[in-house]
UniProtKB/Swiss-Prot annotation:
GO terms for molecular function: DNA binding; zinc ion binding. It comes from the Bacteria. NCBIfam families: recR (TIGR00615). CDD domains: TOPRIM_recR. A zinc finger (C4-type) spans 61-76. May play a role in DNA repair. It seems to be involved in an RecBC-independent recombinational process of DNA repair. It may act with RecF and RecO. Belongs to the RecR family. Coiled coil: none annotated. Disulfide bonds: none annotated. Transmembrane segments: none annotated. GO terms for biological process: DNA recombination; DNA repair. It comes from Helicobacter pylori (strain J99 / ATCC 700824). This is Recombination protein RecR. HAMAP family: RecR (MF_00017). The lineage of its organism: Bacteria, Pseudomonadati, Campylobacterota, Epsilonproteobacteria, Campylobacterales.
Length: 193
């Protein structure tokens, strides 16, 4: 029985909590707990304050389901954005990733889960904002292909254009490291050089 570890319940609880963060293992969690608890307690207090503020203020946009600190997100209330395109993504974090690219200036819709989609409200939004194209920005999987077909079927009466982001060979990756479906799609979706 290790009585030393038993005497550090609060510290070990912090390690356990940090370890529950995705992609953080036991060693990294221990290093973070040690740093925050002993080497930089001021940073720990700042993180605590920032975490509390985020939890108290974060919500999802009533229009697009993206993260927001207001009822309607800045993206949805920005009149300079293009109204003709709506980019559908699976998760709120996908909006962050696409916004960082600065390639898309339209609107978003975060699915979260297909069971939660209010197709009547979505249809009203598509008509009200004069959306002409839905861009599916989903990772390439058979399940997501089925999801796209399902959504297209539910909204086909609106006569929208449905597109999806291109798939292909990632930059700097050798063919032997690419699955055959991705390589085949890239080959069949080739463009003029």
């Amino acid at each position: 029985m290790n009585t030393y570890k038993n005497s550090l319940n609060h510290f070990l609880n912090l390690v356990d909590c940090l370890e529950k963060i995705p992609n953080v293992g036991k060693k990294s969690a221990f290093k973070m707990a040690y740093h925050l608890g002993l080497e930089n307690p001021y940073l720990a207090l700042k993180i605590t304050h920032a975490l509390r503020n985020a939890l108290e203020n974060l919500k999802t946009c009533a229009s697009c389901n993206a993260l927001s600190e207001t009822e309607v997100s800045e993206i949805c209330s920005d009149e300079s954005r293009q109204n003709s395109q709506l980019c559908m993504v699976l998760h709120p974090r996908d909006v962050f990733i696409l916004e960082d690219l600065k390639d898309f200036l339209g609107r978003y819709y975060v699915l979260n889960s297909i069971e939660d989609v209010d197709f009547n409200a979505l249809e009203k939004r598509l008509i009200g904002e004069n959306i002409k194209e839905i861009i599916f920005a989903f990772p390439p999987t058979l399940a997501n292909d089925s999801l796209m077909l399902y959504i297209e079927d539910k909204l086909q009466h609106l006569h929208l254009t449905f597109t999806k982001i291109a798939q292909g060979v990632p930059t700097g990756v050798n063919f032997e490291n690419i699955d055959s479906v991705s390589l085949s799609r890239a080959f069949n979706s080739r463009i003029k050089a």
